[in-house]
Amino acid sequence: MIPRWQPASIPLLLHLDTLRCHHVSVQPPRATMTSLNIKEEDIPRLDGKVVVISGGASGIGLAAANIFARAGAKIFLFDRNPPDSGEAPENSTFIKADITSWAELKAAFAQAGHVDIAVANAGVSEEQPYFEDTFDEQGELKEPGFAVVDVNFKGTVMFTKLAVSYMRKQGKGGSVVITASATGYAPEQNLPVYSAIKSGLVGLVRSLRSTLPRFDISINAVAPAATITKLLPMDIAGPLMAAGLPVSSAHMVGLAVVYSAVARQPRMVETYGKENVLDLESKWNGRTILTLGEHYTELEEKLADLRPVWFGWRNTDLTKKQQATADFR
């Protein structure tokens, strides 16, 4: 059974399709974010499906791999180092690959050969306080490192490009899921570049959600808050938990990743350009699931519904018309 999202009871919304500039006097729509109840037993069988996961040897990637594998999928784990002994599922193959290398990523996809589901999960944290002054041996301001940019943004874009290319050529559709971050919506002041990049990954999902469905390809994101992985080991997570703050397990986030790849939706997040049918049942697409402690929340639909409020009614109407004029489909 493919999990199908059921909307919570919310006040009636005024959708963009009915907006006109003279509606500025109308009461703005109200909406609450949609809570999700995701259970592993709701994941359908995935026998015969091939899943590729970057950063798949540990943390969220490995947790998702084990869930996919229990559903019957064949898994390819792309990473710089193999999983610890005994942690990878039996029906998985490790492929050594640096996500910042186009050549290595191409070779990894070629070795997998076929792709039904692609999870762009590899990521690193900021290696330095980016906007503090550091100096070289001559006392000159030192150029900062760009690993967080290369891995988290460039690598994710390259991985996604290759995945979409394979899915288009195969002609059988597919699903792309990107591991973003809660910091993409609520930035951390001590992680400014990391937060900006994760916001950019959410932007990538928004930019592609209207075009990829032409090929029966969906794209979604998961936005983990504090999660116990190598980026947030237990000795750091412990004080958060002791203070009563929510911390997620890698398994919980991994389950959101798998759900995002297989679920269906009763309506689109929003229409774009020439589109005029919002209530269209289809694959889960263009959405982000926030994972916070043991709670799942879908963010994008309500943000889209409230666009006239935060973007402006007139701005929304005119932008919609501009998009329709430039819509190449």
Swiss-Prot record:
Chain segments annotated as transmembrane: 238-258
Annotated residues for binding of NADP(+): S58, I60, N81, D98, N121, K161, Y194, K198, T229
Glycosylation, residue list: N91
Traits of the deletion mutant: Reduces the production of PR-toxin and leads to a large increase in mycophenolic acid production.
Which SUPFAM superfamilies does this one have? NAD(P)-binding Rossmann-fold domains
Q: Identify the metabolic or biological route this protein is part of.
A: Sesquiterpene biosynthesis
Gene Ontology terms for molecular function? oxidoreductase activity
Where found, per UniProt?
Membrane
> What are the record keywords, sorted?
Glycoprotein, Membrane, NADP, Oxidoreductase, Transmembrane, Transmembrane helix
Principal location: membrane
Q: What does this protein do?
A: Short-chain dehydrogenase/reductase; part of the gene cluster that mediates the biosynthesis of PR-toxin, a bicyclic sesquiterpene belonging to the eremophilane class and acting as a mycotoxin. The first step of the pathway is catalyzed by the aristolochene synthase which performs the cyclization of trans,trans-farnesyl diphosphate (FPP) to the bicyclic sesquiterpene aristolochene. Following the formation of aristolochene, the non-oxygenated aristolochene is converted to the trioxygenated intermediate eremofortin B, via 7-epi-neopetasone.
Name the chain's protein.
Short-chain dehydrogenase/reductase prx4
Q: Which gene encodes it?
A: prx4
